Amino acid sequence: MTIQHTQDLAQIRAMVPEMRRVKCIHFIGIGGAGMSGIAEVLLNEGYEITGSDLSENPVTERLVSKGATVFIGHQASNVEKASVVVVSTAINEENPEVMAARELRIPIVRRAEMLAELMRFRHGIAVAGTHGKTTTTALVTQIYSEAGLDPTFVNGGLVKSAGTNARLGSSRILIAEADESDASFLHLQPMVSIVTNIEADHMDTYGGDFETLKQTFIDFLHNLPFYGQAIVCIDDPVIRELIPRISRQVITYGFSDDADVRIENYHQEGQQGKFTVVRKGRANLDITLNIPGRHNALNASAAIAVATEDDIEDDAILKAMAGTQGTGRRFDHLGEFDTGNGHAMLVDDYGHHPTEVDVTIKAARSGWQDKRLVMIFQPHRYSRTRDLYDDFANVLEQVDVLIMLDVYAAGEKPIAGADGRSLCRTIRSRGKVDPIFVPEIEQLPSVLANVIQDGDLILTQGAGDVGKVAKQLANLELNINKMLG
């Protein structure tokens, strides 16, 4: 069914004239991926945007270049001009700007509430799930852009083809990553919802109860109107179990024989995945996907399912898949660098859950079977390391060389036995790989100088600051020996 998406921004804005009473929108923690995306869209819609963060980064610099005012550090005076204050769950009630906003009776809304306001009169496509949200959001965006539909998008990571994680488009389409970590995705009311998979993560939000998490995903899908569409991965056992409880139109995708949009004949050639997509009532598509891994074939088939239901031309789908550059820090091939003894291939990946690490390892093994796999892993959060300890050990022992950093706390207090040193000790006791523990990230160059060999594939893995190491290595002006100097 073809849907008309050409309504312009002026028409959308005219639907909510009251929103124009808001003059200045202030974001606390504006440098975060999710917050900055919404801030950039609102900035481009003509609102005055201010924000604060603890330090400058490329995201804050980009916002300033576009006209935002960004304060470094949190203080009460930062909110004095604000009509509304936007916060993420990382911001607590004792934050001086939150306290000042309450004192001044300035409305405080969560990030997802502001995203929901952007989506309210648009054709919203929301992408949820434990893993794959960012890449799937980028792939949906790529298809709609290739089809000339100029969508607005708000993603949790850099869409490399666009050079940003958010953009204001001219059509009524809004494609957004939906965050389940704090259950705030329940604020969204999209027309189409994708759920990629459901695993036990962020369990503190759900009282440690997996059934509560599952019900929350069902509630998210039931936010769809009765004519909306739920696009779900039938390969995921939890989703398969939940499908009978979803009272909306359900379209499935996956490798499974009973998927409505089915992947066949997947194989990987280096950086590219190649496969056939079989669709009911439509021609098969022979896909060349410019990012590797079976997990990315699943992400692509979710995007293809959405595009097929929206009657987007196959040519646009094929071009988008072949032309995608992926997303920042998702199997991000940063090139090669000089080891001093030759050259090593460098890949940076954000994955920080055992399932995400596992599929990254499998993609590396499938595409570069002749290379020794060296992983620099930084656990993310003590609570996640504790809750998934054995799963991490099972996954990490698959690599040839494991260099382990200590836990990136992300604001958490240490938990005994749930740190990098303990995880190393457990993996070493199993006898498959002898991990090297590096307590301080600054010590990595000297360790790498003694480990890296010509022809290695190096994976920097994790959601913390290990990505900074990847960027340093990717600077081809440097080699390991110069880093030591």
Curated annotation (Swiss-Prot):
TM segment ranges: none
InterPro entries xrefs: Mur-like_cat_sf, Mur_ligase_C, Mur_ligase_C_dom_sf, Mur_ligase_cen, Mur_ligase_N, MurCDEF_pg_biosynth, UDP-N-AcMur_Ala_ligase_MurC
Keywords of this entry: ATP-binding, Cell cycle, Cell division, Cell shape, Cell wall biogenesis/degradation, Cytoplasm, Ligase, Nucleotide-binding, Peptidoglycan synthesis
Cystine connections: none
Catalytic activity: UDP-N-acetyl-alpha-D-muramate + L-alanine + ATP = UDP-N-acetyl-alpha-D-muramoyl-L-alanine + ADP + phosphate + H(+)
UniProt-annotated binding residues for ATP: G129, T130, H131, G132, K133, T134, T135
Enzyme Commission (EC) number: 6.3.2.8
Name this protein carries in UniProt: UDP-N-acetylmuramate--L-alanine ligase
UniProt organism field: Vibrio parahaemolyticus serotype O3:K6 (strain RIMD 2210633)
Gene of this entry: murC
